[in-house]
Regions:
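A residue-level signal for conserved active-site and pocket-lining positions in enzyme catalytic cores
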Residues: 1, 60
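Charged catalytic cores and adjacent phosphate/nucleic-acid-binding surfaces used
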Residues: 10-33, 59, 66-160
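Binuclear metal-dependent hydrolase catalytic cores centered on His/Asp/Glu-rich metal-binding motifs
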Residues: 21-57
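A short, structured active-site edge motif that brings together acidic residues
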Residues: 2-11
Length: 160
């Protein structure tokens, strides 16, 4: 198990009155670094998150960019986006997210959006187990993985 985070900085949180509303995933981050800087990340914007991820060897991936009230972020400041968000109770408009990834040459990932037992399953299938956070980032950057379905989203595994 490797450290990661789902974050909505103050500028994109659902608790403000007006859009944009966005959630981002930070993948492959060292837990101590996240603990050190985590609160300050809530006060930054997407570009700041992206630069922080680059400086700390992590990836910034937008979660479900087309779900309900969400809108895609600036692709210039993303490493990737969820091309397949497999939450069983939301329509994440995965086909639009897949096109967004392809059009902007972003890494398309998959995730179960596992917040409770109903959501288990799905994600990505890597060619081998990563050794550490840096290796996880390298494997995802290589794009040599399959997005796997879940029991709620019956589909074959696929690659972007």
């Amino acid at each position: 198990v490797f450290c990661g985070a789902e974050i909505s900085p103050d500028c994109t949180t659902y608790y403000k009155d007006n859009p944009p509303y966005r959630e981002f995933l930070i993948l492959g981050i060292n837990p101590e670094v996240l603990h050190r800087d985590g609160l300050s990340l809530l006060k930054t914007d997407q570009r700041g998150l992206f630069e922080w991820c680059n400086a700390n060897g992590a990836l910034l991936v937008q979660a479900h960019p087309y779900r309900e009230i969400c809108t895609p972020g600036d692709p210039e400041y993303l490493h990737g986006a969820e091309a397949a968000n497999l939450h069983p109770l939301h329509n994440s408009k995965n086909s639009k997210a897949l096109r967004f990834c392809k059009h902007n040459n972003l890494i398309g990932t998959g995730g179960s959006d596992f917040h409770f037992p109903l959501g288990i399953g799905g994600g990505i299938l890597l060619p081998r187990a990563p050794k550490d956070e840096a290796d996880l980032v390298a494997l995802i950057k290589s794009r040599d993985f399959e997005i796997i379905g879940s029991r709620w989203h019956a589909r074959k595994n696929y690659r972007l």
